[in-house]
Amino acid sequence: MADAPRPKRNPNSNPSSSETVGNNDDLLNQILLYLPIRSPLRFKSVSKHWLSLITHPHFLHLRTTQPNPRPSGLFFYRYSHQIHPEFDFLSLLHYESPSKPPFKALTFVDDPSDLRILQSCNGLLLCRGLHLYIYNPTTSQFATLPQPPRRVLAPLRCYTTFYAYNLAFDPSKSPYYKVVSINFSWGLPDQYELDIFSSETGLWSPSADPFNGDVSFNPGVFWNGALHWISTSGGDSLYFNVDEERLETMPMPPIPDGWEERRLRYFGESRDHLHLIEIYGPRTTQFNVYAMERDYRGWFVQYRVDIDAIRNAFLEMIRSSLDPSDLHYYQFVILGLIREEKDEESFLVLHIPGKVIRYNFRNKSFRELFDVPRALIMSVFLLKVR
């Protein structure tokens, strides 16, 4: 039996809601902006009109100038002797129905060396193998950077060595990124020099005067237009304003009375805030989360943390073979600090042996997120997807 003919639409009738949306570019833009980035990428094949809309500079500008997004997930580096080792992915957006990871291994380029992630910054990854690469795992696009120029320091005629690389990228201000190369020279009073690569020009250029500093460059933390390098000795830290090419000192929180040493547990950025976690003295499950003033006047206590309940629930975080006064008696690593739009929903992500735990600042509640195989090395990267 033949199918009944479909009724024809009266040209004078009102258009359907789908037609209304499809014919209204402004409305369609607003809908696409609220979807995960992979959805618009798939929708490019719907029609030539949608392809033109999604790839138009106006839509890309709207997408990248949205408020500072939260990280979409954590990548755990899996120990391997392979050139392209696999990563484990923990979604921070959907716990019950985990989203598909943007990648499982760094196979975007055929690099014969041991390809590694150096830094994650606002959706881009800085990777190093035989060459330096900038990789966007959302769009699967990448760029190969030229090697920085090798400096000769007259009159000593000695060469610098490349010590570290840092990525600076703020898509809300510019579509271009910069990579800072920190160069080290032995035997000189001012041991470090900087070179900057700009994706706008495609060139490296020397920057700033030589300087000395007892700080950790691996990795730097990009916030407030600057790369931040934390002190390893308790003295002043440093920050480098990338656009102004200006190096400044940054104070550290004072050590509380009665303690003589500090142990850095976390240094990172979330939702346009710079955070620092230090622990003073041994065997502690209580500590503060500091946030930096935007004008760098100093640190203030943003959150107070008490993970005593986590210790009681997961006794495996106690190293019973050590003396209770030992600095490493409690075994935990702070993987990330996630600030939500509603601050009462902000949380810490912790690793204890075999598990990843979420700790809520406001009510001190916690939940287990993920079982971590013991074979995983805890090199962890937070990835933002715009």
For each of these PLM feature ranges, what is it?
Residues 1-386:
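N-terminal entry/capping and adjacent linker segments that precede and initiate structured domains
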